[in-house]
């Protein structure tokens, strides 16, 4: 478990309460663009970063574990001299958030878990996807990924943005994507969910084929201070498809627990 210095961007009030945004497999920090203005206008200090192996972050050889990705977060907080943060994670980012909540709870004010899962099998599916990406590049999985990320209606209404997200996935380093698949393949956070002490908001997309609402329900049922919100129409990147609703939910959660 050796941390790397991930690429990050800080926006908003330097003295505001820090909010860390952690993204999905195949994305970079641009996926959180719909949240930045709402959070900074409300006075928060917003930290976005690229997962290791993604965007402009280093790409160490894989496989990676969730503990590796969590160590990157703790190192980033240390680098920015942030003792505790509000953590918002989507998909892989939510898994990282649950790991931090279980193993470093003193670093969290609150936890927001969007479109994620505590256990996402079968492992063979992730191994197969990693093998495809290593052999053919991330472009080979980009089109299928955006079909999971957004509902057909949203893709039809936003063809240019859909292409931008497909290009984002295709530009992800193959080794980084495949190595993060390994982290998901070996992950099972279920048994330790009751150890998460942070007030937790769990958000599910009603139309999410990647992490359906039942996955969010299992998390919300097991985390002591959790509440569940299911929103729609929204697939896997609910923060992009329903930014107004997601922003209101996040801001409400942060204000209730400030």
PLM ranges: what are they?
Residues 7-59:
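Conserved HGGG/HGGXW glycine-rich cap/lid loop of the alpha/beta-hydrolase fold
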Residues 89, 93, 97:
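Gly/Ala-rich beta-loop-alpha elbow adjacent to hydrolase catalytic centers
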Residues 98-103, 107-137, 142:
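Flexible "cap/lid" loop of the alpha/beta hydrolase fold
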Residues 121-124, 136-195:
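Conserved alpha/beta-hydrolase catalytic His-Asp/Glu region
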Residues 196, 202-204, 208:
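Short beta-strand/loop motif that positions the catalytic acidic residue
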Residues 217-237:
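Catalytic histidine neighborhood in serine/cysteine hydrolases
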Residues 234-243, 247:
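Catalytic histidine-centered segment of alpha/beta-hydrolase-like enzymes
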């Amino acid at each position: 478990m050796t941390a790397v210095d991930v690429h990050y961007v800080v926006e908003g009030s330097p003295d505001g309460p820090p909010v860390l945004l952690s993204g999905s497999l195949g994305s970079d920090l641009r996926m959180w663009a719909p949240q930045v203005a709402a959070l900074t206008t409300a006075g928060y200090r917003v930290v976005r970063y690229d997962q290791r192996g993604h965007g402009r972050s280093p790409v160490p050889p894989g496989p990676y574990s969730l503990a590796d990705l969590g160590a990157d977060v703790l190192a980033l907080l240390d680098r920015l001299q942030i003792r505790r943060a509000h953590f918002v994670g989507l998909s892989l980012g939510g898994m990282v958030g649950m790991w931090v909540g279980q193993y470093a709870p003193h670093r969290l004010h609150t936890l927001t878990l969007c479109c994620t899962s505590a256990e996402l099998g079968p492992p063979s599916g992730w191994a197969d996807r990693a093998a495809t990406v290593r052999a053919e590049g991330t472009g080979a999985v980009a089109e299928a990924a955006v079909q999971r990320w957004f509902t057909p209606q949203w893709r039809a209404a936003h063809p240019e943005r859909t292409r931008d997200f497909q290009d984002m996935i295709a530009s992800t380093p193959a080794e980084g994507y495949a190595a993060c698949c390994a982290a998901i393949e070996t992950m099972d956070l279920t048994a330790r969910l009751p150890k998460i002490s942070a007030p937790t908001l769990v958000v599910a997309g009603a139309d999410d084929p990647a992490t359906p609402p039942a996955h969010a329900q299992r998390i919300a049922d097991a985390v002591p201070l959790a509440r569940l919100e299911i929103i729609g129409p929204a697939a896997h990147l609910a923060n992009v498809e329903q930014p107004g609703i997601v922003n209101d939910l996040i801001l409400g959660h942060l204000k209730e627990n400030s």
